[in-house]
């Protein structure tokens, strides 16, 4: 009985400590977002989407989409965007759940991002656009194009995921991880630790 009480106290203390750390990081990240925008927000139905533009408005549009990892953002494209802005009107976007865009507490799916990209092109760019996407985001672009061929004039994929990876379906093990990550204290802690450069576990 004594061991159980000790284990319970230790568990509660650990959870409480994680929550304190999470709140400190939350405050710092909110302050950073509020003071270092330098871009615009598209008020989408599922959350605000941060993006930056480069180049003249009358140049042909080009949409640059970053990879989908916990540390990804439009910053990945910054140097290239400045070079391309000599001939294109560049749109660098933070996908929902990444960078300075909103991070709603939902299960993110491929089709969710397909909808986001489709609406962004139609409501922000407002013209068929050349698009370049890295990693997993290439699959969102291809699906969006399959559903609406008027969105893009050209598609460029940088280091796209293999078809072997893309065809995988969630198994019971991954569903169990999802349930664990959906617990707010644990999910946020794993996210914050996984974005640290020296942290060995990537999600």
Q: In which residue ranges do the predicted regions lie?
A:
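Conserved HGGG/HGGXW glycine-rich cap/lid loop of the alpha/beta-hydrolase fold
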Residues: 52-100
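Alpha/beta-hydrolase fold catalytic core
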Residues: 1-62, 86-88, 126
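Short beta-strand immediately N-terminal to the catalytic nucleophile in serine-hydrolase-like folds
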Residues: 131-134, 158
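Conserved alpha/beta-hydrolase catalytic His-Asp/Glu region
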Residues: 166-168, 187-203
């Amino acid at each position: 009985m004594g061991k159980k009480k000790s284990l319970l106290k230790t568990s509660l203390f650990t959870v409480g400590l994680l929550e304190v750390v999470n709140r400190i990081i939350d405050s710092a990240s909110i302050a950073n977002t509020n003071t270092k925008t330098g871009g615009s927000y598209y008020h989408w139905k599922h959350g605000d989407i941060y993006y930056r533009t480069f180049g003249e408005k009358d140049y042909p549009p080009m949409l640059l989409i970053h990879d989908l990892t916990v540390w990804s953002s439009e910053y990945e494209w910054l140097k290239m965007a400045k070079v391309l802005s000599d001939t294109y009107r560049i749109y660098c976007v933070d996908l929902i759940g990444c960078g300075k865009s909103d991070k709603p507490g939902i299960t993110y799916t491929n089709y969710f991002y397909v909808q986001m990209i489709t609406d962004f092109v139609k409501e922000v760019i407002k013209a068929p656009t050349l698009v370049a996407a890295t990693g997993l985001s290439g699959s969102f672009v291809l699906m969006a194009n399959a559903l609406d061929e008027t969105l893009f004039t050209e598609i460029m994929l940088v280091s796209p995921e293999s078809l072997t990876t893309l065809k995988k379906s969630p198994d019971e093990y991954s569903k169990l991880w999802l349930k664990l990550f959906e617990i707010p204290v644990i999910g946020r802690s794993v996210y914050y630790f996984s974005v640290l450069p020296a942290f060995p576990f990537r999600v």
